[in-house]
Amino acid sequence: MASAAPLAGQIAVVAGATRGAGRGIARALGEAGATVYCTGRSIRGRLSPYGRPETIDETAEMIARAGGTAIAVRVDHTVESEVESFFGRIAGAHGRLDVLVNSIAGEEPMMAQWSSFWKTNLKHGDAVLRQALLSHIITAKHAAPLMLRRRRGLIVEITESDILSAGGNPLTQSVKLALKGLALNMAAELKPHGVAAVAVTPGFLRSEAMLERKGVQEANWRDAGKKDKNFLESESPVFVGRAIAALAQDARVLERTGQLYGSWELAREYGFTDADGRRPDWGSADIDFSQYPSSFLEYFRTTSEIQLEFLSALTKRTKRFLSQLPRASSKTVKKKARRTAGG
């Protein structure tokens, strides 16, 4: 019989647990029995500068009301000294870290997703790169040593899609691609140390902001499907959270390192459902493309075709280069891993 709290005793950090996917992930990890640290910048009395009311305090309280254990800690993940201090606190209190989820967003008002690159307002360029990308690197940098010492752990990068991103804004698209690449690069370095790194994307996410945009609440979200059929295949933030919880429970998760998964794919494999008992599957949804401007669809097609040609050429070159590399002996690899882990 499966344990009611399979992650009991594990320590998890969800960076960006204020709202959206991050909040759902924190809730699902708490539901599975982990002690969850909910970090972010928005706390009571010090809300988001972008007008959002959610706080990490609320997220921690949701977990506690459901019978879980959660601690809200205000951390600005763009400030390395704050991040270093926070993980020092984790080390002192627990001496371990089992799961890190990087769900820090770049804040949509700054991202301006669909503007053409020659029209991009770069006023917030530095802030976007620091908040949406560098924060992830800073956080992983200071979390990893807690996993390396125990030769186990899971780092998850939350991304927006399971395909190559398209859209003109160079800030937005560079960040989206970089987060996928970050998981891949970390996986290569961490695998010899027993630590897994993956990227996971939700499907059509019913975040707080999306519900507001559709003019509905979680209790009546299906009403929005009358205008947008695609929304009927949407998922609550808890669904992607349960995907992360399933990975964290998997004793063979290291075999998955370096991969990109959709929440729906992991649901098929692990058998979990959304909070309402459904199993949404955005990957096989019959998408109604009439909801999107034809100019955008054509641009997306052109961009994707160019990207695939680029990747095909890059794959051939990389394979040719790899065929010329001498293979290191297993002893050499193990020695290097020990040296790296020891600093």
Residue map of PLM features:
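Active-site loop of short-chain dehydrogenase/reductase
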Residues: 10, 68-69, 96-97, 147-161, ...
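C-terminal helical subdomain
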Residues: 199, 218-311, 336
